[in-house]
Amino acid sequence: MFTKRTDLAIEAHELWRESAGKTTRLAGVKATEKKIQGYPVTQVDILDREGEAALGKPAGSYRTLDLTAFWQRGDGFFDRAVRAVGQQVKELTPDSGPVLVVGLGNRAMTPDAVGPLAADSILITRHLIDAMPQHFSGFRPVAALRPGVLGTTGVESAEAVRGLVDRLHPSVVIAVDALASRRVGRVCCTVQFSDTGIIPGSGVGNHRSALNLETLGVPVLAVGVPTVVDAATLTADLLEESGLPEPDMETLRSRPENLMVTPRDIDQQVRDLGKVIGYGINWALQDLEIEEINALLS
């Protein structure tokens, strides 16, 4: 059976409701909405195995931050987006202890570069706390890793991260990666936060070993940005919205040309979102204002 592809829990919840015109509450799943810094946040909590089976995702908390208004460049748009991202990170990570930030993805493949770009904006402090305690003793120890991809390194991201976790003993791993969305309107306009971990490369259809509590032994906060839409899923949705009969989607899915759709200005969008996510993580982990973060990174 053809399944519409999405990495977003909010869209998996939508698909369940659409599957048979369901309007009743889904057992094992709780969904709530709120606004932070003017940006909408939808939280989907998968509570048990029934919820896991319905949405096809592991139990945990999934929060989707809608940054559509970010691209309108309104008053204080960047600072508000940074604080909105940072607030989610604060609520889903421990208050103290070392942190390892992992920028997953292939920097040479633009839709997959959001992880490495976010890591570029992380304030690295682990080595400075011991070297210059008079200046950095009040900072939280933070290290960053850009593990690259298996095809260019010969090493699975999970293997590289596991080695560092064994060495650094972080209180949490924050993994940033690209995702796939069902809808074009959510591409580069949403950020998903999940305390269940992540499978590197899932956004561009290149699934690798998972990064989660079971594989690493420490909590993993996944921060994902949808940068692509699966072409078969997009086709099915457009035909459905137009009231036209669907083609043979199994045949379409089985074609060797596994196409992904991405915006034409994806270069600028992933750069902007990488910076917002990196700054948001800094804001959550360090007792600094955004202007101070900017000064330390410049």
Residue spans for each PLM region:
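N-terminal amphipathic/basic leader segments beginning at the initiator methionine
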Residues: M1-A59
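An N-terminal, well-structured beta->alpha segment
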Residues: E50-P94
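Conserved active-site and cofactor/substrate-binding residues in soluble primary-metabolism enzymes
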Residues: G60, G76, R80, A84, ...
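Short glycine-rich or small-residue beta-strand-to-loop segments that form or flank ligand, phosphate
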Residues: D66-T68, P98-M109, A144-G148
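Gly/Ser/Thr-rich loops at beta-strand to alpha-helix junctions
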Residues: L104-D112, G151, A178-R182
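Glycine-rich phosphate/diphosphate-binding loop of Rossmann-like nucleotide-binding domains
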Residues: N106-R140, A144
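A structural-propensity feature for long, helix-poor, extended segments
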Residues: S137-V165, H169
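A structural signal for small-residue-enriched, beta-sheet-centric alpha/beta enzyme cores
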Residues: L145-R146, A175-S298
